[in-house]
Amino acid sequence: MMEPREAGQHVGAANGAQEDVAFNLIILSLTEGLGLGGLLGNGAVLWLLSSNVYRNPFAIYLLDVACADLIFLGCHMVAIVPDLLQGRLDFPGFVQTSLATLRFFCYIVGLSLLAAVSVEQCLAALFPAWYSCRRPRHLTTCVCALTWALCLLLHLLLSGACTQFFGEPSRHLCRTLWLVAAVLLALLCCTMCGASLMLLLRVERGPQRPPPRGFPGLILLTVLLFLFCGLPFGIYWLSRNLLWYIPHYFYHFSFLMAAVHCAAKPVVYFCLGSAQGRRLPLRLVLQRALGDEAELGAVRETSRRGLVDIAA
């Protein structure tokens, strides 16, 4: 964010690095293809969760994650177009800066939501009685709204301190805010990994040791997906803005992995919820991926309607 130019600045840069242009174009083309697939997948998840799937707390989390990934991929695909066209197309500075800031904003939102849903799923597994009886009804909605609001505040502070949107940028304040963002990223990663580890230990220490399935299994797979595919983008972005040294090839690698991270989530949802040897509608597949809670909610709703019909 300290440098508005992002796309196109690495290809052919005068830093003495020997780049294989053909290899870079292949990586960028793969990134665009994965981004397009991710847009379709997250769009399907967004549509199904907002219209067809029974609303439960975890579905609301996935709805917000899909929304953040959808915006991220849209900005991601547009931002690398100048690299893909090898400088034949260039964006104005304010467009590049807007794409960069919006992309990091959605990245932090998605990571924060993953940490929140990991903690809530861990609490549901460790304290099932308390979770069923004492959990505030609108906790998920409040957590999601607060996450978007706090990430938007960080986004505005970084935009004000590091760009010329709101006046002259302050280099010292900008670096301080990026250090805060780095600490936030580390805390979110530790929280997410700690909650997932406790959830895994809880499942393994159960009486029959069943394999993680349903929504707990989905959370564990999503966390692993972030650590291997989503984290490199955050490391690159923070290193770039804090002027830390990073290998030159890490630029294309982190962008490709970010596209893999967002595009693979819908695949994980649908694969985990699909039944072997059976063809199910996407709505039922996604409902199965949400786990027993969604199915229990649907059963309760059906039972309540049956009682109403009998009483009538």
UniProtKB/Swiss-Prot annotation:
Protein name in the entry: Mas-related G-protein coupled receptor member E
Which GO terms fall under molecular function for this chain's record? G protein-coupled receptor activity
Q: Name one GO cellular component term.
A: plasma membrane
| Function, in words | Orphan receptor. May regulate nociceptor function and/or development, including the sensation or modulation of pain.
Extracellular side of membrane: 1-20, 81-106, 163-176, 239-241
**Gene3D superfamilies noted in UniProt:** Rhodopsin 7-helix transmembrane proteins
What family is it from?
A: Belongs to the G-protein coupled receptor 1 family. Mas subfamily.
Please list every transmembrane segment annotated in the UniProt record, as residue ranges.
21-41, 60-80, 107-127, 142-162, 177-197, 218-238, 242-262
One of the Pfam families matching this protein, by short name: 7tm_1
The places in or outside the cell where this protein is found are: Cell membrane
Q: How does it sit in the membrane?
A: Multi-pass membrane protein
InterPro entries named in the record:
GPCR_Rhodpsn, GPCR_Rhodpsn_7TM, MRGPCRE, MRGPCRFAMILY
Q: Which residues does the entry place in the Cytoplasmic compartment?
A: 42-59, 128-141, 198-217, 263-312
Alphabetically sorted, this entry's keywords are: Cell membrane, G-protein coupled receptor, Membrane, Receptor, Transducer, Transmembrane, Transmembrane helix
A single GO BP term for this record reads: G protein-coupled receptor signaling pathway
The organism encoding this protein is: Homo sapiens (Human)
Gene behind this protein? MRGPRE
